[in-house]
Curated annotation (Swiss-Prot):
PROSITE patterns: ADF_H, SH3. The keyword Cytoplasm applies. Residues 291-300 have a biased composition (Pro residues). Residues 325-335 have a biased composition (Acidic residues). The SH3 domain mediates the control of pseudopodium number. It comes from Dictyostelium discoideum (Social amoeba). Belongs to the ABP1 family. Its main location: cytoplasm. GO terms for biological process: actin filament bundle assembly; aggregation involved in sorocarp development; cell motility; establishment or maintenance of cell polarity; negative regulation of phagocytosis; phagosome maturation; pseudopodium assembly; regulation of actin filament polymerization. It is found in: Cytoplasm, Cytoskeleton; Cell projection, Pseudopodium. This is Drebrin-like protein.
Amino acid sequence: MASLDISDPDITKYIKLVQDGNPANRWIVFSYVPKSNNKIKFCDSGSGDLKELREELDDSSIRFAYIRFVINNMPKFVYIPWCGDGVNGPIKGAFSGHAIEFSKSFKPIHHQVNARSEEDIDEKAITAALNKATGASYDSGSKVQGATKGTFIPQSVSQGREAATKSNAEVKNVINKNDYNKIQESAEYWKQNQANKSEPAKPTRPEYNLSTERDDYWKQQQAEKQKQQQQQQQQQASRVNAPPPSRTVGNKFQEQVSKPTETAPPQPRPAPSKGSVLNRFPAATQQQQEPPAPSRPAAPVPSRVNKPAAPVQPVYQEPVHEEPQYEEPQYEEEQQQQYEEQPTEEQQYYQEEPQQQYEEQPTEEQQYYQEEQQQYEEQPTEEQQYYQEEQQQYEQPTEDQQYYQEEQQQYEQPAEEQYDQSGYLQAKALYDYNGENDGDLSFREGDIITILDQSDPDGWWQGSLPTGEQGFFPSNFVQQL
């Protein structure tokens, strides 16, 4: 396509006359030079309106028109490239490019109309478009809160400014009453939504809301649960403080002492001899085939006859489950008790004497005897060491001890939650429930329900009965075991 030739000086001359507001030249028309498809020439001009210009446009020609309008005392310019329906095809293809290129010579252009027939050139449509153009329409807005304003069009700049500066009070009078109703409805809707959010989460159905009786029942259940927890804590504390059950030689001796004495007359025991404790375990001595341990040396006997007996020290029980060194005094205490149960003639004589006389004035011999006894108890002899080795062999837990330990472990395990054989949680029905919808689980008060799913945030759980029925039920009708 050849470039457009606008070298004719009349083109710029007449364009200038139209833009300057010359009354004799309101519109101008340009066309191609005959036998040329790219050179433009001046065709005609006039002082009339758009109807006069339309007479210069026919179906078999191409024209470029430029017309001046006055809108609100302001000049507005319209560019109309015209291509009739009877124009040849090749010329139509070049026309679109020439129209765009020629529009650069018409400045300013407030509106452009690409016309193909007389119906495209409508004066009312062009005037409305110019009113909406920048700087031409002084309307403050065609719509206010959904209502359309009147068809008032300002005829001057002062009228446009007055319409644009109307007060808000006058604008509110135009608002439709339906808008007020919509505002009120939306406000009530949001109030209800906010009120529903503040309430605690409960099942969606209103007929399953908790009543005051159920609230009292749950409070009572919580109080009982707290009491049970306190009792369990107290029992655990007492079990920690109490020694574990054991079956040692010292415990057997204490059980025999605590039993009521039989009616049979007590028979005197023989005096303790060497290896008296070892005689209790003949099987172990035969297997080891070791010589008997040396016997405990006898305590020194004071020379004075009126010497009181040594004060009996309390016997403290040592737990079996601890290290063997704490079990060491058991044999020593047992042996000491045997000596105390069978007093010799000298000890009987000492016990017959009143002890109060000697307790008020302790002699030097008593102090010496007490110090020597402490040294003897602090330093274990070879016989005590042998007893310790013997005891370690027989400290293996018997069947009774294993049974006591297993029973104690079972008792110390806290009962947290009950599970069925499949590993699911269980719950107990507090009220009767008849399912109204498909998929609901019906049950009676006291039924045991296996809980399958608790993920519903609205409080509807899925469970099954022992009969095999499955379904959904409200969580506030059951108590988890």
